[in-house]
C-alpha cells in the first residue's frame, strides 16, 4: 500500500512548545546565555535580546529537568537554543503530502543470524562527513546522498560528495518538494530515471529552492535499483545495514529529540505511523548498550549537534515510526 504522509524537516527545529509566559531569568541563566551567544556568534538588538533570553532560559530549564531524571539519553544546548516552536514552525517547518514508497512491496529477507553490532564508520572510508542542511527542509536530500555516497564507496572504494542541491532543485517530478520536504525513496527513483547525480563541487548547496541546473555530462553517481523495505520490518532494516548498506529512514521528531546530546534516544510522545514522520536520516549501524538495542544514525544538522552529528535511537520498537519508510539504493558502478 501507499501511505500518504507529511514529511517535514528543517535546518533548525523547535526547542520549546511555543510562546511562553514571561520568565524571571536568574543570573546563572544570563551567564550561560551570554556564553552561548559568544560560542554561536549571536548578536541581537536590545528588544530581541530579551526575547531570545526568555527562549533560552525556557529551554535551559527543560534540559536541566530532563537530565536530572532517569532517562536513557541526555540533552544539551545547541545552535537552536534561542528559538521557540512558533518561530521555527513559521520559518523552517513545511508540510507537503508525500507517498511513502517504502510501503509498496514486501522486502525479501533471509533468516539471519546477523552480527550483534555493526558500524559502517569503522569499515573504512565508506561514510561521508556529517553535513548541515541549514534553514531548508531538505533533510531528505542529505539522507539520500549519504546512502548513495556509502553505496558507491562500498562497491567501488571511491568516496564522493554528492549534490543535495540538485535534488532540491530537480526532483519535483518524483513527488519531492525541495525545501518543503520529500522522501529518500523518491529521490533514489529520481536519480535512477534521471541518469545520475552530480558532485557537490559542481552543483553547490545553497539551502534554498532554485532552478534545476543538472548537467548529465557531469553526473558521477548512478542508481541501478531501489530497495524499499517492508513497512514496520525492523528486522529487514537490520539485515540491510548488516549485509549491504546504510539505510535511509524517516521518523517523527518531537521536542525532546531536538535537544539530544548523547545516549539512546527513546520517546513516549511520538507516533509510529507513516503519516506522522517528519525527518529523514541515515542508519549507519546498530548495537546494544546496557541491554538496550539501538540504531546509529547520521543526522544533517551539522557536526556540533548530538554526538558529533550522530545520534542513537532505540531499536526493535519502531521508535517514532522509524521503520515506516526505509530504503536504500543499489548503485551502478
UniProtKB/Swiss-Prot annotation:
Localization: Lysosome
Keyword hit for Protease: yes
Catalyzed reactions per annotation: Hydrolysis of proteins, acting as an aminopeptidase (notably, cleaving Arg-|-Xaa bonds) as well as an endopeptidase
Gene Ontology biological-process annotations: bradykinin catabolic process; cellular response to thyroid hormone stimulus; dichotomous subdivision of terminal units involved in lung branching; ERK1 and ERK2 cascade; immune response-regulating signaling pathway; lysosomal protein catabolic process; membrane protein proteolysis; metanephros development
GO MF annotation list: aminopeptidase activity; cysteine-type endopeptidase activator activity involved in apoptotic process; cysteine-type endopeptidase activity; cysteine-type peptidase activity; endopeptidase activity; HLA-A specific activating MHC class I receptor activity; identical protein binding; kininogen binding
Protein function: Important for the overall degradation of proteins in lysosomes.
This protein's name: Pro-cathepsin H
Organism the protein comes from: Mus musculus
Encoding gene per record: Ctsh
